[in-house]
Amino acid sequence: MKNFLCEDFLLSNETARRLYHEHAFHQPIYDYHCHLNPAEVAQNRQFDNLGQIWLEGDHYKWRGMRSAGIEERLITGDASDYDKYMAWAKTVPQTLGNPLYHWTHLELRRPFGITNALFSPDTADQIWHQCNELLATPEFTARGIMQQMNVVMAGTTDDPIDSLEHHKAIAEDDTFNVKVLPSWRPDKAFKIELDVFADYMHKLGEVADIEIRRFDDLLSALDKRLAHFDAHGCRAADHGIEIVRYAPIPSEADLDALLARRLSGEVLSELECAQFSTAVQVWLGKRYAQLGWVMQLHIGAQRNNSTRMFQLLGADAGFDSIGDRPFAFELAHLLDEMDQTNELPRTILYCLNPRDNEMMATMIGNFQGGGIAGKVQFGSGWWFNDQKDGMQRQMEQLSQLGLLSQFVGMLTDSRSFLSYTRHEYFRRILCDMVGRWAENGEVPNDLSLLGPMVEDICFGNAKRYFEERA
């Protein structure tokens, strides 16, 4: 019987153990999509205590606490950091079977070095003091943790109107060797149905010094901001798409009319929203191809389901879930609009509903080519699939329907500096899966064949994919 969270955690066979310890463990982290605050990296934030670094903005933990009956004051309210932390300590023993239990103890082990205690109300006070002492040292600032965890690149998520001043400051600081690069998140520019759309057009126009009245004005403003992002090292875009919309692109005059009507406050039809969204996203995708960027499409979240809590806390507070609207037809046509002129960029497709895994794994095969290995990717298990079964299912289905060997691997998609252990979690699951194949005779038990593939999936593929610009 294995001990909990031992050195061979999740590694069920000898080949898996060798793959992990000899090939995966020491690989750097290329965290190409996250939600870290770049200001906290630029300013090298020193966290006051463990509760602050652990619980601020972490809606995964917040959902668990609510399910455990913790009152909202101790989750997002005005309670002290210590009281919120103790509420989390009360919750953790109830999360057995949930990845939160694994993540919590992995985060205590790395970077804090705590391996001799299970987190609970009984151990929480000792762990609080032990971790707070470490958090007061230079090795446990925002930058210190990134360096401890062997991060070489972090791709943040940024709005086209952002100044990118913090990315600039980080890039100009020779004392810090981690790349922190912006990623372009243009959702508000193509979701014409949003209540904030008109206000956003005004803000975008101000930043770009262009009055946005016609469709071409919008494209010109976006183009200026694309150049700004590219100059600051951006190599990726990310579109959050709750519902994939596609409609044949109308004439520019019709798009001008749609934009004018929306800016005047008129509500557009579903078809008109789809026409506008398609036109903007296809134009953006072609520009990404010209710039050598990667386009990421995160598809299928059903957001802000609780009106009451949305009004109280706003978005990204733990009230989102998996959507179930089919989208294969629309997605294929959206990608094809770019591919018809050979202007589809490198693209990563993520689905939130695991029902769509096989569809996505086959969809990527429709648009490969151009001499680019793995040009179109089926992204790692996202959000609610960011757990043992979800990641394993995604990789197994990719291997059966595509090429696992070309997979760009894991990303944290997180707001927390302690989430880098999710790369360790992923690597252990990957090595166990490949090791089982070898032990069962499904692939050769040859580490000279399997080891380099594991190394590439952990790091090499992502580095090449995001840094090649052809």
Swiss-Prot record:
Entry EC number(s): 5.3.1.12
GO BP annotations listed: D-galacturonate catabolic process; D-glucuronate catabolic process
Reactions catalysed according to its record: D-glucuronate = D-fructuronate; aldehydo-D-galacturonate = keto-D-tagaturonate
Protein name per its UniProtKB record: Uronate isomerase
Family named by the database record: Belongs to the metallo-dependent hydrolases superfamily. Uronate isomerase family.
Natural source organism: Vibrio vulnificus (strain YJ016)
InterPro entries reported for this sequence: Metal_Hydrolase, Uronate_isomerase
Pathway connected to this protein: Carbohydrate metabolism; pentose and glucuronate interconversion
Keywords: Isomerase
Membrane-spanning parts: none
GO molecular function: glucuronate isomerase activity
Species classification: Bacteria, Pseudomonadati, Pseudomonadota, Gammaproteobacteria, Vibrionales
Keyword Isomerase among record annotations: yes
